[in-house]
Amino acid sequence: AKAIELFDAIESVDSAALATRLDRLVGERGTRTGGPLPVYLQVNVDADPAKAGFTPDELERELAGVLALPNLEVAGLMTVGFFTGGGEAARPTFARLRELSERLRAADDRLGAGLSMGMTDDFEVAIEEGSTLVRVGRALFGERPAPA
């Protein structure tokens, strides 16, 4: 609930249930300055058990319902590449998300064109594959401190 007050967008909506909950919370708090809350739907295009997100099949089944939520604007899709192997290892993941986005947007133009993919170790490849938003915190702020 606090996130909808603190953030301009949420990039990790990994289920229709979470989208529905966010929509309800935004609605309960009244109209947001600037309109609906922009969200990116997290897609696990690799079926990696270590990652959260819609599978491509789940997204296809549930997208229309999420797009119909009045207090959310689906700005695009988000994914995380493989954690090992560097940028080239993540290229197929990024290409699959771009292709999925193109196909889904051809069927329903309410889905935003944003592609949030790429982090510090693979953002160059993500941009080559069409990323419109990269997450490069470690490149800007350095490594996270080890837990105490």
Name each region found by the language model.
Residues 132-133:
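Divalent-metal-activated hydrolytic enzyme cores
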Residues 146-148:
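Active-site loop ensemble at the mouth of alpha/beta enzyme cores that anchors a bound cofactor
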Residues 1-123, 127-129, 138-143:
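Conserved alpha/beta-domain cores
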